[in-house]
Amino acid sequence: MAEFQGYLELDRSWKHDLLYPLIFREYIYVFAHDLGLNRSNLLENVGYDNKSSLLIVKRLISRMYQQNHFIISANDSNQNQLFGYNKNLYSQMISEGFAVIVEIPFSLRLVSSLKGTEIVKYYNLRSIHSIFPFLEDKFSQLNYVSDVLIPYPIHLEILVQTLRYWVKDASSLHLLRFFLHDYYNWNTLIIPNKYISIFSKSNPRLFLFLYNSHVCEYESILLFLRNQSSHLRLTSSGGFFERIYFYGKIKHPVEEVFANDSPTSLWFLEDLFMHYVRYQGKSILASKDTPLFMNKWKYYLVLLWQCHFYVWSQPGRMYINQLCKHSFSFLGYLSSMQINLSVVRSQMLENSFLMDNAMKKIDTLVPISLLIGSLDKMKFCNVLGHPVSKSTWADSSDFDIIDRFVCICRNLFHYYSGSSKKKSLYRIKYILRLSCVKTLARKHKSTVRTFLKKLGSNLLEEFFTEEEEVLSLIFPRTYSALRRSYKGRIWYLDIFCINDLVNHK
């Protein structure tokens, strides 16, 4: 960011909220290319080549404004060449460059806030790491939960409209509209409901920025409603009703105002606190109150999506479940409420009596069927969970093959360290271990039994090394003291970067 700010010091247009001239600066695309190379492995790198040229990008932008958008040819959509150039390459270049440009106001605002003397505190917004203590401490006190899938907008134009509150440069927004419109014309044979899905895969950085802006506005409105409800709830109910009774007598001195009517008319102000948790496109609403209260918030969300974001959502698809009877999927875990019943005998003087004590505890399980489906998609096993050889890795060295399998296995154990039961993970380890052996046997053109007899089982000894054993070898004193003082599950702070099941599809 410091290097990028050095370029911006030479270009004064951004200080006047003019981002449009930056689209014609070559360092923007160089910076976007460097970001693509240094990006996390969760996103694929953009395939720039040596033939890319800023001059062609300028010509392509000029042609966007000149061509007739009312004439669309279905035959032209199948052509890989646009004006004699590779349309996929330069559409990705413009997308990556524009994503960098629209992020400038947010980045500079963040840098300026960090340099200031007073840092604005957002008490309602938390890091993703706060989800784990929430599951451990507060979730067991709740009764009802509703897992909500945040709907995608029907058209990307809705995402562009959200940027109007953040980006004040109208020329940049017009260019973004032209680009999205042209991208749709280049792919006119795409089914409309799959358009956003394809755009998100080919232009991940720009789509993530647009979608995050959309979710940010949605959550700001939702948190405003939630805060208003909580502030009204915190008002003293006795004094609140007394003031209403007093003002009622002043306004209608002849008529009698019944205090019993006030709680009925203002019942909706006494709602208990609503908990909201989100990761990517999936969120959870949880409360200790009745299902009627949850239904009210469900229709709040539906009306918010339909009236403000013009997104159709069916209320019937948002299910409200009781935690003690249903489980829900979130962050790659299958979570449910486990109730442990115990009987306590109490004696006072000569009288003794029995008390039933119910202890609630959150139970986080490994979704074995989803994990097997993920391994089947990556060709480590079949649909039934039977291990198969990874044919695409057979050309690698033995060390690389074993290292890849061991890395996947340890990452899964690392991710599901917060699971209540590890039995399903040992099945996943068995699948990966046998798939590794079959891959090595295929490379050496041998059978599994012959290969193991020749090299021995010590070759795959790393598969049997638990992560807890690795930690005990690295930090022997600290880890032994930790295990003596704490017997519960362990949540690692980097787990959301590992498991592909967490990424909401």
From Swiss-Prot:
The keyword tRNA processing applies. One of its GO terms (cellular component) is chloroplast. Signal peptide: none annotated. InterPro entries: Domain_X (IPR024937), Maturase_MatK (IPR002866), Maturase_MatK_N (IPR024942). Keywords: Chloroplast, mRNA processing, Plastid, RNA-binding, tRNA processing. Usually encoded in the trnK tRNA gene intron. Probably assists in splicing its own and other chloroplast group II introns. This is Maturase K.
